Amino acid sequence: MKTRYSVLSVAMTAAFYTQYAQADLREQCLLGVPHFQGEEVTGDQTMMPIEIEADNAVINQPKDATYTGDVAIKQGNRSLFADEVRVEQNGEQERRAFLKGSYRYQDNLVQAHGRDAAMDLGSETAELQNTEFQLVGRQGRGTAESGLFNHNKRILKNATFTACLPNDNAWSIEGNEMIQHIDEEYAEIWHARFKVLGMPVFYSPYLQFPIGDRRRSGLLIPNFHRSSKDGFAYSQPFYWNIAPNMDATITPTYYSRRGWQISPEYRYLTKLGEGIVAGEYIGKDRLDEYRPDDNDRKRYLMHWRHNMSFLTGWRLYVDYTKVSDKRYFSDFDSEYGSSTDGYATQQFKLGYYQPNYNLSISGKKFQTFDELDVGPYRVLPQIDFNYYNDELVKGGDFKLFAQTARFENDSKLMPKAWRFHVEPTLNFPLANRYGSLNFETKLYATHYLQEKGSSKQADDMDKNVTRIIPQVKVDLQTVLEADKQLFKGFNQTFEPRVQYVYRPYKDQSNIGSGLNQSVSFGYDSALLQSDYFSLFNDRRYSGLDRISSANLITAGGTNRFFNEKTGVEVFNFSIGQTYYLSPSKIDDLSQNSTTKRSSSWALESNWKFHRKWNWHGAYQYDTRLNQTSLANTSLQYKPSQDKLVQLSYRFASKDYINQNLRSNTYGQDIKQVGAVVGWELTDRVAFMASHYHDIALKKPVESQLSVNYNTCCWSANVYVARKLTATPIGSPDTINDLYYDNKFGVNFELRFGTNYSSGVRKMLKKGMIPYTEQYGIN
């Protein structure tokens, strides 16, 4: 009988057997580079005294002197060692040292050795012949037939350079002339030949590369992958360091089944703010499965993110993402969106902020990827005003929120509207060492100016709608500490909370159209998803178009356990439920009303039973349907930042999905298990493996395996992945018809002594379902 092992099980086993990696890679790499001995001195080196030591000296004052036998010349931070040195002096104007035979030169930035050299003792300049050099305190070494070294520049002839340690010739760059700019931390090279293991693989008439922490313009290492959908793909990124405050990366990619894609990305930091502008473009997608229109097969993405603070109190925020079609994120991996998001956001906000008030104008639009007859509304403009004053009423905190918004929809069936909203709130908080009591009154006052859709089939609308709803809320909280320990070594607290909310009923069916209830109610309201903490929200719906009636009591509590010695929280458990004294509704339709006297039970818990172990669980029981509506749990072992194992499970009933997503076509429960391993096996090898499986469908959702190999001067990543993808056009699209994209890829990275990461965190971010942490105790 043969035994079968999954990739993930082998990966998890390997992880547990390599809990102790070798010494940190950075420490190992820096052990292989020279370090400056002694104390660095600052100031003009040429004005510092010259110390000369030698076994013998022949001095011909005042013109020259010849020193032989273990000669050492020291001035400031630089030293020169040779068998024979002749020093010539021309009055006080010039002092030069000439070295015959082998020599060693060192300062606080570089060490070198070779044959024959000259050093100007009055200008910090050294001319070195047939030299081998190595940077001090960082990776970088090379050779040159001749070199002119000074305090801010090294000019090398017929030179080589590599960031690899001695005796490691993994890669190198050769050129007829190389100029190393010390302060700017980059090098220029002419007629550059890039070699791997001594074999030339690339030529460029001119090239720049970093010799420090700052990035420089030039070609980056290409990436390769092959997938069942794209075919073979080759990416060649080019980095452009435009200025100290702005740069760009331009990446052409060739897909054998799709054609050429160009992906520019521009990053900036100016007085007008900081942000990123990016794009992805294919002029004509050749893939036969993609046939929306044979005359228009362009695929593109546009992205702009901007943050700006200016004058006093002014802020501007822009987040704009637009794609050519609904399938874009299913077909292409992108940093600017994912197929699991379901939409792309296009929004901006300009605001003025002061300590007790703020004013903003904004706009927002969603590009959805679902097949919907009627999409969500766009809002432009939206003007918000917030005002705070805790001295207006004695013992009370006054707050005022006001908004004006304009809503429009692409569908001619849908109405347009202006919404004017005012929401004053008055809080009376009371608190002492036993707990807190907050009494709140609020008024929702809203007026709508509605315009019927332009289509003849559009619903008739009330042109003017006014809605005024008062609200009263009482919130009581306290913290009780147990006198006795339930478990030895752990102190226990219980935090009960009771909240009462009252709002009268107002029929709101005349606000907006019922045609888009698969997306929202009215113009921007949707039923909120619930968990323990959302039980204490004032409202069941987001936005302002649906404010349900309320006559309810919410009761809950959190039990916490703390380590008696350290005071650190190790366990908590929360449970709560809402009790409806009368049905909560927004109109006369039964499906939009609470029919039971109580809501779902909501439970949430976190347990850190060891500093390396975390557990989280959440559960909701629907009392209306007498069944579980939501559940999720995850267990994580994380001994360090680059070592973790996580197991997870999530469940959502089809009734809960249908209630919260009217356009749902899933037709059954979601039952999904997942496992993720990210582990630094040694200082050089790390891997990530993940697998998500749908129990209901009995089919995988996504599987990944990625291995990273790191050295001091390069790293390589090899990965395989299999994930669900969009249904090809013209193919069957039922619950049992699932389509996968299989991918294999290789990425290389040159390291110039500035990046020693294992790559685990980068690998964890990849995939359709990226790794997340949701633990309430850290």
Swiss-Prot record:
Protein name listed in UniProt: LPS-assembly protein LptD
GO biological process, one term: lipopolysaccharide transport
Compartment(s): Cell outer membrane
Gene: lptD
Function text: Together with LptE, is involved in the assembly of lipopolysaccharide (LPS) at the surface of the outer membrane.
GO CC entries: cell outer membrane; transporter complex
Signal peptide positions on this chain: 1-23
Assembly: Component of the lipopolysaccharide transport and assembly complex. Interacts with LptE and LptA.
Record-stated family: Belongs to the LptD family.
InterPro entries documented for this protein: LipoPS_assembly_LptD (IPR020889), LptD (IPR050218), LptD_C (IPR007543), OstA-like_N (IPR005653)
Alphabetical keyword list: Cell outer membrane, Membrane, Signal
